[in-house]
């Protein structure tokens, strides 16, 4: 992919639309978004997914030449690909969002023209790293559909994460709204309140954009061999639904970390921020257990903590966000430890909110 990608929207005059959606870091409060909690999340400029929609005579969902590969050198090569990358590429994601988008518009009286299109995608988000790669593809595709059908102002921005999540649910993907909110808001730092009362009333949370510059310098650690981010919630959710007091109280404490984190960020109290990040991971570990989290994922956190940095999962495993409060000297130690352990480490690239004027107009006043 182009390391210097085009603007989010291009080619309006000829009916061609291109959109990017960035990888996401769950900074504090995750995974309480699935449990009526609170989170702080943001997207990063390090990785992104890209979708392109162009008018065509027939409706075509275009397979990716690598991610949707159907031709192999040998049977062994086919099996190797399936064992490492699974059975699924991005075509199913594009088809699912097309279905969910069309049904939502039909159910809500939003008229769509009858022109056809070709929809394609690309992505450089590492697979299974807990950076929300699947929803980034769906988010980028949804943005293309909104523009192609000229219905951006008819579908409020708060509703769009639900459409993305519903598309993923069609495919059996286990997730919450947090990632989709961060990606729909297109950058910036977002505080999210998923309180049950509000969710039951309107179907989405209370989303507040914060200044991305409140964040201290952060780093990303990830491993090239993937983690399974689709099964991590399963056992804990069942216990939560069964009324397990330990799970319920621990999840409430994780949600509280997002509130404390918002205060710490506004005050730039980074020493407290370090403690909150570490506490977030410790609570997750106590609920899910080491076997569920995976030895390599835990090792990434411990590599950072070994040199006195704060660390937690960006999502459900596969990547870790790190804060080095002591600055460049501590970053050098982090880089050396990651090199020894075979992990990739790089600075987090922050991106400001990319909401357009038409998007902002759809924000509810409630």
Curated annotation (Swiss-Prot):
Catalytic residues (positions): 179 (proton acceptor)
Entry similarity comment: Belongs to the GHMP kinase family.
SUPFAM superfamilies assigned: GHMP Kinase, C-terminal domain, Ribosomal protein S5 domain 2-like
Class of enzymatic activity (EC top level): transferase
Annotated function: Sugar-1-kinase with a strict substrate specificity for D-glucuronic acid and ATP. Involved in the biosynthesis of UDP-glucuronic acid (UDP-GlcA), providing nucleotide sugars for cell-wall polymers. May be also involved in a salvage pathway for glucuronic acid.
Site (described: Transition state stabilizer): 24
UniProt binding sites for ATP: 126-136
Cofactor note: Magnesium. Can also use other divalent cations like manganese or cobalt.
Documented EC number(s): 2.7.1.43
Single Gene Ontology MF annotation: ATP binding
Gene (UniProt): GLCAK2
Species for this entry: Arabidopsis thaliana
Catalytic activity: D-glucuronate + ATP = 1-phospho-alpha-D-glucuronate + ADP + H(+)
Cofactor(s) the protein requires to work: Mg(2+); Mn(2+); Co(2+)
Keyword terms of this UniProt record: ATP-binding, Carbohydrate metabolism, Cobalt, Kinase, Magnesium, Manganese, Metal-binding, Nucleotide-binding, Transferase
Protein name in UniProt: Probable glucuronokinase 2
């Amino acid at each position: 992919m182009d390391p210097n990608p085009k603007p989010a929207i291009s080619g309006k005059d000829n009916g061609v639309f291109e959109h990017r959606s960035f990888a996401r870091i769950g900074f504090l409060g995750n995974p309480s978004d699935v449990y009526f909690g609170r989170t702080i999340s943001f997207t990063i400029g390090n990785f992104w997914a890209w979708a392109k929609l162009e008018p065509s005579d027939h409706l075509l969902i275009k397979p990716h030449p690598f991610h949707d590969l159907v031709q192999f050198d040998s049977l062994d090569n086919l099996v190797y690909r399936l064992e490492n990358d699974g059975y699924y590429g991005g075509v199913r994601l594009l088809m699912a969002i097309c279905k969910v988008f069309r049904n939502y518009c039909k159910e809500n009286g939003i008229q769509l023209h009858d022109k056809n299109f070709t929809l394609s995608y690309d992505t450089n988000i590492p697979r299974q790293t807990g950076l929300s790669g699947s929803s980034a593809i769906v988010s980028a595709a949804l943005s293309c559909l909104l523009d192609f059908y000229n219905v951006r102002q008819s579908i409020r921005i708060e509703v769009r994460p639900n459409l993305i999540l519903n598309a993923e649910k069609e495919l059996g993907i286990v997730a919450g709204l947090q990632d989709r909110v961060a990606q729909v808001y297109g950058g910036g730092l977002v505080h999210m309140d998923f309180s049950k009362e509000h969710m039951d009333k309107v179907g989405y949370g209370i989303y507040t954009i914060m200044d991305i510059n409140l964040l201290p310098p952060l780093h990303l650690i990830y491993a090239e061999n993937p983690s399974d981010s689709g099964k991590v919630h399963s056992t804990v959710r069942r216990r939560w639904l069964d009324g397990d007091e330990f799970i319920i109280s621990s999840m409430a404490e994780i949600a509280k970390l997002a509130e404390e984190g918002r205060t710490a960020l506004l005050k730039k109290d980074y020493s407290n921020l370090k403690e909150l990040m570490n506490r977030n991971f410790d609570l997750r570990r106590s609920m899910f257990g080491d076997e569920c989290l995976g030895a390599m994922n835990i090792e990434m956190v411990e590599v950072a903590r070994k040199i006195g940095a704060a660390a937690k999962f960006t999502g459900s495993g596969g990547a870790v966000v790190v804060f080095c409060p002591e600055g460049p000297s501590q970053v050098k130690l982090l880089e050396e430890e990651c090199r020894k352990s075979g992990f990739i480490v790089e600075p987090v690239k922050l991106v400001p909110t990319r909401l357009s004027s038409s998007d902002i107009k759809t924000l509810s006043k409630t």
